[in-house]
């Protein structure tokens, strides 16, 4: 028995191994065709089929369609004329709800999209964010296919902003447009998203503007002309508003005959513009008027002597413009002081400067001796080129160059009172640089 059992054991193992061997797999059945490609007889019948193969194919198709990426139901889709259009169907041509969708599915999608855009109808989706483009412009380039909310009462509400006098939007809740504050212009116009405050309280038509004060003239009309021209009047100067400060022109459009013209003093320093000896001329106060020679005439009888004859024509009355420049620069105590304003008393940015401009400007103590005209004397420094050429310096006591007391620059213009004009010309002619004019 034991030998027989030992002899039959390998046979049992062999049978078990042969029974456990895997069988080759059967080929998978081909996928069933979609319902749209079924025969007409099967599609036309409304009764459910009891064929197991048909039921299996139907279930496989539903499983494939529902497990896909979009889980879309194939057509046809219901047409419901009284309902709004299905936006997903208009965009993609498919609908995951199939025949159970409660929206309209028009056959011609392009025609439906075009008609919706013509009517200006946009979808209202309460749970979605609002379409920002629709809020700004009142339109939407996506039309009914846009996935955002389009409230009808807010159409273009973001674009309805108030404009300032220059046509730029006023947005107090936004930051100020830096480019507009510097230049007074904005290339984006009324579409800029920043704030554009008013630069002026009044335009050029306003006479009480703090930036452009009113101009008063002491004479409104000149004497009648002896020729064929009738009596003429001097026109009032017109000023163009600008974000920067502009000094009004001191020259009015007029016809000036040969003679002397009385203009306001050009001296901006505390002292005399051109110091001369007390024996030849009198010192003038800073507010006194000075004579401006329009032409130098050489007398024919005294031409060989090299002397310039005095002016024979009487002084011609010219309108005097009294300008009172107020402090138009902004005071910002919480900002640092404008260094240019503290040095010169002026600021090219005017009312739009972002720094502080105190009314009482503390002048720094000069570190050198000042000349009679209020300019610094720095013997060891380089000569101020602007002062050597024109006799003035816009930096005043703050200039870092030397301003020695010197004779005025030689030219056709001479400054001084009417009584001291001839002695001044004599002194200029005696200088070596005037030899060319006397030869």
From Swiss-Prot:
Q: What is its main location?
A: nucleus
Q: Where is this region: Disordered?
A: 1-52, 277-306
Instruction: Return the GO cellular component terms, semicolon-separated.
Output: nucleus
Keyword terms, alphabetized? DNA-binding, Metal-binding, Nucleus, Repeat, Zinc, Zinc-finger
Pfam families assigned:
zf-CCCH
Q: Where in the cell is it found?
A: Nucleus
Q: List the biased-composition ranges (Pro residues).
A: 22-37
Q: Which GO terms describe its molecular function?
A: DNA binding; mRNA binding; zinc ion binding
Q: Low complexity compositional bias: what residue ranges?
A: 7-21
Q: Where are the zinc fingers (C3H1-type)?
A: 80-108, 125-153, 171-199, 332-360, 378-406
What the entry lists under SMART domains is as follows: ZnF_C3H1
Looking up PANTHER family in the UniProt record yields: PROTEIN PHOSPHATASE RELATED, ZINC FINGER CCCH DOMAIN-CONTAINING PROTEIN 12
Q: Identify this protein by name.
A: Zinc finger CCCH domain-containing protein 12
